[in-house]
From Swiss-Prot:
A motif (SIFI-degron) lies at residues 9-24. In response to mitochondrial stress, the precursor protein is ubiquitinated by the SIFI complex in the cytoplasm before mitochondrial import, leading to its degradation. Within the SIFI complex, UBR4 initiates ubiquitin chain that are further elongated or branched by KCMF1. It is an enzyme of class 1 (oxidoreductase). It catalyses: an aldehyde + NAD(+) + H2O = a carboxylate + NADH + 2 H(+). NAD(+) binds at residues 262-267. The gene is ALDH2. This is Aldehyde dehydrogenase, mitochondrial.
């Protein structure tokens, strides 16, 4: 995902991982020590109330890295109480200057940058993504996100309003309160930053549940939050499982807002829980089946490489992956041939190796699910052009896979696979492809490749998606909002828009003896 990766353009992958590109990347420790595996509440580390733990697994080997405290409802209750206490009127956090909140966020970014090599290695160990990507892409964007929101801390404010009569009226942007945040496993550090940045910049307090597959880096950042000087209770982090810890956050009567990134299926559950409890505010960044439209006048070399990047980046584990590649019929055969050749050349292997482009899938569940989709694609008549099998004798590695002759009604064209499986579909006209691209329950992202500005403008307006890229893919910046249409979610993250979900707007109107202009 992401701008830091996309700016390397066609050099991404093995060209990004060339000797010249990796000179600035420190050598990783392939067995980084785990320092934080408990529950973080009130700037202190705790075992779970139940004393239960769960294993976190290295997806490259299937071996257990360590045991992690398994948070449950009782632990969430403790975390919410700590957060609520930190949010009381007159508390150090509530009385803190907004500019000081910004300095704390900048300090946190500085500490993450100090420990960047360690965090990148730990992310690769726990998640499986290539270390070079962890270091150059994920950590780079974490730092930019936190520093961007640090700058907003004392600049997001209300305004005076000239209402009629002898009155003075103004608005205040006040923090929502206790914010439950549930982050996914595909970008653990980055999604943590996307959630923490706007919440803390606007003065909220946080109870965060980290994904059970990848808890280690987000927990280590908790240590840095304390070191940065955030008061106790402002950020609390609970590792655990969705049906227990996650559900406890979503249904908690003293949580004022919940932000979730993950599957549409779980997003539905969270929205129902929020509504049936205290009607807490909800923002959801959910699944996608994003159309990537290649017009016949597109730059072929660029379009092939970007379509490859759009699907295969992060082992295909991106909510906004370009997972429906629509190619105009007069260039279809050449595009397919080149895409297959590119997929066959993709380097799959040890994610700590600087030559590796693709590591393992995050866990056995995802591994089996993706292989199941590949089998379904073959059974339903899609043409398997390359890959389709297991890529290693241990770990959760899958061969880069390309299907051609994919039809809109096939399962692999409708459902989110979340793996290294490219589906290429043929179209004739621009009107046809708009209808087919929009014929989806999802609407997270889309892309268009063309040299014709009129076509680009028409398609970018016609496509039902929260983000449309033109002649590029996966270009992100902390300044630009991201979120979905339809069943891809509600609300926006990043940019100034990302602050709106974390504030209440209060109107204050004062009677004055006489109003003058």
């Amino acid at each position: 995902m992401l701008r830091a990766a996309a700016r390397f353009g066609p050099r991404l992958g093995r060209r990004l991982l060339s000797a010249a590109a990796t000179q600035a990347v420190p050598a990783p420790n392939q067995q980084p020590e785990v320092f934080c595996n408990q529950i973080f509440i009130n700037n202190e580390w705790h075992d779970a109330v139940s004393r239960k733990t769960f294993p976190t697994v290295n997806p490259s080997t299937g071996e257990v890295i360590c045991q992690v405290a398994e948070g449950d409802k009782e632990d969430v209750d403790k975390a919410v109480k700590a957060a609520r206490a930190a949010f009381q009127l007159g508390s150090p956090w509530r009385r803190m200057d907004a500019s000081h909140r910004g300095r704390l966020l900048n300090r946190l970014a500085d500490l993450i940058e100090r420990d960047r090599t360690y965090l990148a290695a730990l992310e690769t160990l726990d998640n499986g993504k290539p270390y070079v990507i962890s270091y150059l892409v994920d950590l780079d964007m974490v730092l930019k996100c936190l520093r961007y929101y640090a700058g907003w801390a004392d600049k997001y404010h209300g305004k005076t309003i000239p209402i009629d009569g002898d009155f003075f009226s103004y608005t205040r942007h006040e923090p929502v309160g206790v914010c439950g945040q549930i982050i996914p496993w595909n970008f653990p550090l980055l999604m943590q930053a996307w959630k923490l940045g706007p919440a803390l910049a606007t003065g909220n307090v946080v109870v965060m549940k980290v994904a059970e597959q990848t808890p280690l880096t987000a927990l280590y950042v908790a240590n840095l939050i304390k070191e940065a000087g955030f008061p106790p209770g402002v950020v609390n982090i609970v590792p655990g499982f969705g049906p227990t810890a996650g559900a406890a956050i979503a249904s908690h009567e003293d949580v004022d807002k919940v932000a979730f990134t993950g599957s549409t299926e779980i997003g539905r559950v969270i929205q129902v829980a929020a509504g049936s409890s205290n009607l807490k505010r909800v923002t959801l960044e959910l699944g996608g089946k994003s159309p990537n439209i290649i017009m016949s006048d597109a730059d072929m070399d660029w379009a092939v490489e970007q379509a490859h990047f759009a699907l295969f980046f992060n082992q295909g584990q991106c909510c906004c992956a370009g997972s429906r590649t629509f190619v105009q019929e007069d260039i279809y055969d050449e595009f397919v041939e080149r895409s297959v050749a590119r997929a066959k050349s993709r380097v799959v292997g040890n994610p700590f190796d600087s030559k590796t482009e693709q590591g393992p899938q995050v866990d056995e569940t995802q591994f089996k699910k993706i292989l199941g989709y590949i089998n379904t694609g073959k059974q339903e008549g899609a043409k398997l052009l390359c890959g389709g099998g297991i890529a290693a004798d241990r770990g959760y590695f899958i061969q880069p896979t390309v299907f051609g002759d994919v039809q809109d009604g096939m399962t692999i064209a409708k459902e989110e696979i979340f793996g290294p499986v490219m589906q290429i579909l043929k179209f004739k006209t621009i009107e046809e492809v708009v209808g087919r691209a929009n014929n989806s329950t999802y609407g997270l992202a889309a892309a268009v490749f063309t040299k014709d500005l009129d076509k680009a403008n028409y398609l970018s307006q016609a496509l039902q998606a929260g983000t449309v890229w033109v002649n590029c893919y996966n270009v992100f910046g902390a300044q630009s909002p991201f979120g979905g249409y339809k069943m891809s979610g509600s609300g926006r993250e990043l940019g100034e828009y990302g602050l709106q979900a974390y504030t209440e707007v209060k109107t204050v109107t004062v009677k004055v003896p006489q109003k003058n202009s």
